[in-house]
Amino acid sequence: MNKMALASFMKGRTVIGTPDEETMDIELPKKYHEMVGVIFSDTFSYRLKFNWGYRIPVIKEHSEYTEHCWAMHGEIFCYLAKYWLKGFVAFQAAINAAIIEVTTNHSVMEELTSVIGINMKIPPFISKGEIMNEWFHFTCLVSFSSFIYFASLNVARERGKFKKLMTVMGLRESAFWLSWGLTYICFIFIMSIFMALVITSIPIVFHTGFMVIFTLYSLYGLSLIALAFLMSVLIRKPMLAGLAGFLFTVFWGCLGFTVLYRQLPLSLGWVLSLLSPFAFTAGMAQITHLDNYLSGVIFPDPSGDSYKMIATFFILAFDTLFYLIFTLYFERVLPDKDGHGDSPLFFLKSSFWSKHQNTHHEIFENEINPEHSSDDSFEPVSPEFHGKEAIRIRNVIKEYNGKTGKVEALQGIFFDIYEGQITAILGHNGAGKSTLLNILSGLSVSTEGSATIYNTQLSEITDMEEIRKNIGFCPQFNFQFDFLTVRENLRVFAKIKGIQPKEVEQEVKRIIMELDMQSIQDIIAKKLSGGQKRKLTLGIAILGDPQVLLLDEPTAGLDPFSRHRVWSLLKEHKVDRLILFSTQFMDEADILADRKVFLSNGKLKCAGSSLFLKRKWGIGYHLSLHRNEMCDTEKITSLIKQHIPDAKLTTESEEKLVYSLPLEKTNKFPDLYSDLDKCSDQGIRNYAVSVTSLNEVFLNLEGKSAIDEPDFDIGKQEKIHVTRNTGDESEMEQVLCSLPETRKAVSSAALWRRQIYAVATLRFLKLRRERRALLCLLLVLGIAFIPIILEKIMYKVTRETHCWEFSPSMYFLSLEQIPKTPLTSLLIVNNTGSNIEDLVHSLKCQDIVLEIDDFRNRNGSDDPSYNGAIIVSGDQKDYRFSVACNTKKLNCFPVLMGIVSNALMGIFNFTELIQMESTSFSRDDIVLDLGFIDGSIFLLLITNCVSPFIGMSSISDYKKNVQSQLWISGLWPSAYWCGQALVDIPLYFLILFSIHLIYYFIFLGFQLSWELMFVLVVCIIGCAVSLIFLTYVLSFIFRKWRKNNGFWSFGFFIILICVSTIMVSTQYEKLNLILCMIFIPSFTLLGYVMLLIQLDFMRNLDSLDNRINEVNKTILLTTLIPYLQSVIFLFVIRCLEMKYGNEIMNKDPVFRISPRSRETHPNPEEPEEEDEDVQAERVQAANALTAPNLEEEPVITASCLHKEYYETKKSCFSTRKKKIAIRNVSFCVKKGEVLGLLGHNGAGKSTSIKMITGCTKPTAGVVVLQGSRASVRQQHDNSLKFLGYCPQENSLWPKLTMKEHLELYAAVKGLGKEDAALSISRLVEALKLQEQLKAPVKTLSEGIKRKLCFVLSILGNPSVVLLDEPFTGMDPEGQQQMWQILQATVKNKERGTLLTTHYMSEAEAVCDRMAMMVSGTLRCIGSIQHLKNKFGRDYLLEIKMKEPTQVEALHTEILKLFPQAAWQERYSSLMAYKLPVEDVHPLSRAFFKLEAMKQTFNLEEYSLSQATLEQVFLELCKEQELGNVDDKIDTTVEWKLLPQEDP
């Protein structure tokens, strides 16, 4: 080393010896910024060690795609020149000279240090810079990445939601994929044109034409479409499919960057090219490479490199085809939701390739279930239907995989369905009705058994495609495209069903007319009401007039008027067709269906006509006698049994006696009624008779006792209380009366703590079960680690210590080696003018193939076909050398210097060869010096932006109306927000703390004092609180927006990037830093980190103590900033809740928000021509508000309620029309009373209830609850704390269990643990919900969900209960249970209930009074009996014929018997007449006439009863349909509240 130190360039340099390499690696780099290490293995072998990037190039050997030279300011720079310019070669020459001198005692220092380095001729190129080149490739790659995300997301969503059903309706598999493909191909071509224009217009690609870029992008886009299809098939979850497609594209596309640095093996390149992002990146690399050398990609160019681009085009086209084939393959092979999928080798079956006509399944007469043929539970089919079996079901079994094992939904079903009949499938919730319909429609596949439709097997795919042409299917759920209008939906599905284009418009008009949808035909489906969506779904099913109609609860959610219209439509279409439907409404099945099939727990119980079922399982007729105190039960019973010995007394109460009479004894009725007419002196006030209903049949089949159906009075009418089964009711009443009283159970502070704990538990459960949210959060944090991982990889690839041996074999051929690329011979140019044999001989001793030429022939630098050349000058005793290198050979200069050094030593007859290697120092602190910290800063930026993924759950609560439901149930806003914060803040703190721990101690490597560590933790806690509260503020302000965590996180990120850039530009000026930390909460923690780095930097530089103390003070000051922000944000939340939040029931003890008093506005309209009962109710409501002392204050008082909405603008230039939803409605609900609100869809029932709850603010009028003289918002401490509210929509959390819902609401309402457990257990037992108690809500049936909502509304014994269509979607058994509970709750005379419903049976069963609404106005109100007396003075005669051919003769006979009879409607064999009261009395004579007519015309059955409220309701609904158009309430528009009413 002393010899080396004599070199001229070593002046001023220090040479330090170390005992070993470890000392050199660890100690010296800390003291010396720039240092060169020399490690000798022996005398002739050594290794040079440099700091990375100081003396050697920053990359390894280049591949052909990387730029080796660049131009700057008119000069050309090449990477390999760094060896020469930065002194690497000088060190090498000095050390080699020293070794030679020590070995040979000859000094060659002058010869070696005077070697001149020359670059060979550089071919023309375009200089763009490597970073720009890589950024260009990355931009090209990600230009379509967002596309594949949205394509995968949309296709997966559409496939999961619509494809199966559209396939059932006749959509072909190819049509589905082609429609999406063509849609996205248009997008791809537009984007490809745009990208090609951009790339060829800006100085990036100069010599490659537009068509090449366009073709590459187009083929890549097509492959991405196919890849999106494949992802949507492989991954069912739309969100995951989109993310998987995006990550697939980015990852494999980034992997394509390896072609910029490595020459991959050909086979590996072809394999990786099966991944289209890799092939695209490689193609772009090829284009830029050829463009760099001024050739570009030009077609046709057979002699050039264009064939490589052609190969890329072919591989991208092949990738597209490859992905499409796998898409179609996995579409058939992967099991669907039911676990059904084709065999993996389905394509080897002959049936797949040849669409031969399958032999139809022949049905023989004896091919019936032997059980059914001998079972009297099944009515034999009349001979006229023999041979008309349209559907044959044989031993159909359907199994599902449940959590506890296999669940049998259907268990060996056998029966036939006949053409020309309407067949109804009946059964309890979960009986298997929908499963059977899904199997018949092809939506599902049976596990075992077979089914045929018109002798065509459903199990054969080819047959199924034929069957679907003739099937119309209405699923249980509404099915339509939300963004299309009603007309457009019908038009689309008409085309899917294959209706001829010429007939589409005519067919659409027919459906609109038949279902009375003219008023909604141009309205977007998303804005339709539930009943209107149901109409549209049914309309889609009957498009094309299919021969087979399969309808799953087609009239669910329809009002009676619409329901009767559907019945008429189906009756008209049943001739020569098959109609099979399911329903929960027994009356609908009784009237509409010719044959009923009962299922129970997946088994077939019975089948037959109504008369057969009623005779088999019915009780018979119900004779109800209303009595007074003079009535002697024994005498009356004896009288009845004289006429009908089989009569049984079923119910006895103080006011009523109910007897069951056998069906076959109707001939005895006239005499019985004649005697009853004479019993007025025995205490009989009036009597009524009703026939057995299918409800009773259903309950008897299920082994349940039934509540007596509402009776139809046929005698002198007085107020009637419907009598229920006294045993069941008394038991239910005992259960409910024993529930704990909760309204005064706890103090405000204790209740607040209990509510906080309940909300925190809720948030924890939601967080634990919302895997999607956690997955997104983990994904974002994972993305934050990507830059660090990439830096690690790049550090490994380009910066990590690598030992490179500079041997001639790197570039030059050996003597016995066959010529191969990229090795060449070494060119020796003799410029000495004499013989240089000694030098040549010494060079050959190094096993190098030489090519010797004279300088006069070539100078050695003009021919870049050689990897390197040595130009020899001087004379034999004093050689001088110049070395010329090919600019693409990065390590050429060190190799040639080694060759020259060994040649000189060989001249002195020494055979040893000097071997030199190069490596670099690997130091931890080099990371800071070289910017490795940038990746970790990115990690901190992302971490500070993830609070929206944690703190925005309130948006989903708001959109599901759960939040308002909690407020109505008594939850305080402060308890809600603080309860959420108890979970969100610790979670976010753990994330922040963990990431900062990693950042400080792993990436930065500096140690914090315990004091600073404590301050850091305090600051992190404050920032976690501040950012979570900020997120709460944003979620409140933008709660009506879509919950978009990613959008807000990205917004935070952009803000942080901008602020960080400003901080860097201002050199972290203290004032700017503090201001940004104060006003930008997401930057607070990052600014704190910057201060800590600054402090650590000052300590390392031994800065003055006063400067360090100043920074310490700043750090302590900034620690208080997030806590100040937290207080401000919490106050903002309080202000928002006070101004714009949901109405609260009582004063919030923390936010100090009092219930707001409503501003009552005078009603803009005066009532005109009101019914006298409605007018009396208005006066009573007004008196309840103004009278100082009332004997009995109503529980609910609604006075002059008026509600107006504004329609949404249809265009920018249109004006908003005002719609009136509620018009001058007044009513009172008394203590111990159930008031029913009935009305057509859109009549204003739900709006009325929402105004009472405070969810909707009335435009005018006032609501008073619990007798308060002010509004409900001004309650005192001794008044109600919460309402019992069951909304029309199920406001539930899908992933929480039923038990968790009940426990949450019990805590919110103030129940203690023991009381809550007692209440829950008793209510669950009363409604038979034990099996569903631990099941997630999303797995429950609609009926069970309604039960849960109902239980939540009555939990805690509220004094005011509001029920908005609570019994929708429930089977008769469930309805009976809820009716019993509701009746038992009102036994408490302090409690009042308001109920809305569409169904008269519900209202008559549970309501004390009813009010009917039409177009937002109250048309009538009163007790059930009062309304019957007032509007139902006529009688209804229904006759069911056995032979429809007798219609005319029968009609003539009826007019003879009842001259004023009016023919109402006719459903096939059912005839209905309205009879005036004078034609009917006396009833005994009327029944005598009917009995005689029954015998004469062989009638199946008849019933005579007073006109029901159903008919009254239908008449009023017709008024709404035909009313004033301007006044009609259109619920199909998305109304916007008046400006002053909602923020």
From Swiss-Prot:
Record-listed ATP 1 binding positions: 427-434
Induction: Down-regulated by cholesterol loading of macrophages.
Biased amino acid composition, Acidic residues: 1165-1174
Residues reported in the UniProt entry to bind ATP 2: 1239-1246
Domain ABC transporter as annotated: residue spans: 391-626, 1206-1440
A Pfam entry, by short name: ABC_tran
GO CC annotations, alphabetized: intracellular membrane-bounded organelle; membrane
Tissue specificity remark: Widely expressed. Highly expressed in skeletal muscle, heart, brain and gastrointestinal tract.
GO MF term list: ABC-type transporter activity; ATP binding; ATP hydrolysis activity; ATPase-coupled transmembrane transporter activity; lipid transporter activity
CDD domains (alphabetical): ABC_subfamily_A
Annotated stretches, region: Disordered: 1153-1177
Keywords on record: ATP-binding, Membrane, Nucleotide-binding, Repeat, Translocase, Transmembrane, Transmembrane helix, Transport
Top EC class, one word: translocase
Positions with biased composition (Basic and acidic residues): 1153-1164
Family recorded in the similarity comment: Belongs to the ABC transporter superfamily. ABCA family.
Function (record text): Probable transporter which may play a role in macrophage lipid transport and homeostasis.
Protein name as it appears in the record: ATP-binding cassette sub-family A member 10
Organism of derivation: Homo sapiens (Human)
